[in-house]
Amino acid sequence: MTRQRRSSGYTLLEIMVVVFILGLLATIVAPRIMGRTDEARRTKAVADLAGIAQALNLYRLDNGDYPTTEQGLEALVERPTAPPLPKAWRAGGYLDHLPADPWGTPYVYVRLAAQRYTLKSLGSDAAEGGDGTAADIDAHAN
């Protein structure tokens, strides 16, 4: 009695079908995942801006006003040395560190008239203005 030996493995046709199905899935799924990256970055920027705005409000409560444009957001991490000096700056600061926006650009802070400021991320293009993912993301204090 002789046994027929069958080799194990996949046929070329089976491999081609699997590759085709994987390629089809990749073309459907990839665009959806890629679009989520920009959405996630914008969401992170909004969250960062909210955290920085909260720290700015705490600074104002302690010192009577927001930091000047010249003092900038660094006044939330290290005690300002340029006038007007803070009256009651918290030991340890208001933030551990200044985050960069999700595109690696520093957030922009400008102190406006009495008790007001503008705070923003310049978006993916790191330039003023823009559309879509390049649009600026703003946070304002009334």
Predicted regions and their residues:
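Conserved catalytic core of two-component sensor histidine kinases
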Residues: 19, 46, 53
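N-terminal leader/signal peptides at the extreme start of proteins
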Residues: 1-10
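Short, surface-exposed interaction loops/tails
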Residues: 3, 38-43, 54-57, 63, ...
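Hydrophobic single transmembrane helices highlighted by the model
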Residues: 11, 15-16, 36
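Short, glycine/small-hydrophobic-rich surface segments
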Residues: 56-97
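Alpha-helical hydrophobic helix detector
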Residues: 16-32
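Aliphatic-rich helix starts adjacent to a transmembrane/signal segment
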Residues: 32-50
